Amino acid sequence: MEEILAKELPELFKGVSDIFAEKKDELCEMDANMGDGDLGLTMSKGFGTLPDLITENMDENNLGMTLVKAGMKMAAVVPSTMGTLMSSGVMEGGKKLKDKKSMGRQELVDFLEGYVEGIKKRGKCEVGERTLLDAIHPAFEAAKEAFDSGKSLKEIMEATVEGAKKGVEATKEMTPKYGKAVVFAAKAKGIPDQGAMAGLYLLEGLGRYFV
């Protein structure tokens, strides 16, 4: 498989919907220690609706705009901070694929680059500040490296997940700078950031399509 057609996007994101349903309680528990305790609910609700939102906004000749429109609708479903960050990633990633009919090797890298830009733009955050970005940015860097090495679409996706895992691990040594996590900064040492974990699960969910 070297490309994903626009009409296959709902199935691609079904893996994300499934993984967040499975990890809902785990993410809520992590978030209860460092935040509001609703992260798992937000992720399962938002990404749970995304496959249907993609279907409803499907344009088989424009994969990018399909994602942009679905991302906008997703933002309305989960208007919380993390919901907004995740849906902004979908929208900005979609903008990178405007007028594309399919997602191949280059398009996957471009989508991830857009996802990073969406998080940065909406969250006003940078790498190293213990956020979702600390999983997605190293994932994008790993994807780019795999692409440059001539890896297949499946291999690029696998590299993306590995990059995110390393990013999540690195958050254990980072100090939180945003939200309620700042109050619990002393407890953060040695514990992965829950937002970064959500980013890893997003990518692992996408990876299920290739299994």
Show which residues each predicted segment covers.
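N-terminal loops that bind phosphate or other acidic moieties
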Residues: M1-V211
